[in-house]
Design a protein with these regions (language model features):
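Substrate-binding/catalytic lobe of Class I Rossmann-like enzymes that use SAM or dcSAM, i.e.
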Residues: 58-169, 183
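General small-molecule cofactor/ligand-binding pocket signal
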Residues: 6-10, 99-102
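A short glycine-rich, Lys/Arg-flanked "PGG" loop and its adjoining helix->strand segment in the class I
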Residues: 37-52
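Short SAM/SAH-binding signature in class I
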Residues: 19-29, 38
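Short, cationic low-complexity segments
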Residues: 174-193
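A short acidic, Gly/Pro-enriched loop at the edge of an enzyme's catalytic core
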Residues: 8-23
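Hydrophobic/aromatic anchor residues within beta-strands of the central parallel beta-sheet
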Residues: 2-7, 53
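Active-site-proximal loop/turn and secondary-structure-junction residues that shape catalytic pockets
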Residues: 11-13, 27-28, 59
Length: 193
């Protein structure tokens, strides 16, 4: 990918420029509710007029709530799993179109199960790098989170956002075509077929 994009480790508030695509994966959980407005303002300001943003975040399908004290202490200090309602309002206030919202229900439970299986398959390598306490804690984290996604209303949200409501075709069909890698705006007239 190095010839197609540039990777920089920096605060999202320090990014400058204009982009045709913005992708945020696993970061929104660390922004904090008081900063959602500024976050989506940044997304809007950084998008070109016909640009598209994809915000991929762990979320809750319940109303807003608190984060597990154990997760806050040992895994994601300062992290918070947002309810969809907490993200939608600041998106609307920034006049961004939610051109698509996808909710992955059990997908991440399966991902966590695979991570646990791989961790256990490599437990001796992990123990060579980390103490037993850490290995037990990591295993507990993977199992507990899998169960949370499977039974306690944890999901993954994918918000597709744009400044213009016609930035993408009307349906998701363009995502599944063989030529999906091409500029999606070229296929707008095919959206209703």
């Amino acid at each position: 990918l190095a010839d197609r994009c540039k990777f920089e480790l920096m605060d999202y508030r320090d990014v400058t420029g204009a982009f045709d695509r913005i992708v945020s994966i696993g970061m929104f959980e660390h922004v904090g509710v008081p900063h959602y407005e500024a976050y989506f303002r940044n997304v809007r300001n950084l998008l070109k007029q016909d640009g598209i943003a994809l915000i991929h975040t762990i979320g809750r399908s319940d109303p807003p709530d608190t984060t597990s004290p154990w997760i806050l202490k040992y895994i994601f200090p300062g992290g918070y799993v947002p309810a969809m309602s907490e993200a939608i309002a600041p998106i609307e206030r920034q006049y961004l179109f939610a051109t698509d919202i996808e909710v992955w229900r059990l997908h991440y439970a399966q991902t966590l199960r695979c991570w646990h299986d791989r961790f256990m398959a490599n437990i001796d390598k992990a123990r060579a790098l980390y103490d037993d306490r850490f290995c037990r804690m990591w295993r507990y984290y993977l199992i507990a989170c899998e169960l949370t996604f499977r039974y306690n209303h944890q999901v993954v949200f994918q918000f597709q956002l744009a400044k213009e409501q016609d930035a993408v075709p009307l349906t998701r069909d363009y995502l599944y075509r063989d030529d999906a890698h091409k500029n999606v705006r070229k296929g707008l007239h095919h959206a209703a077929e």
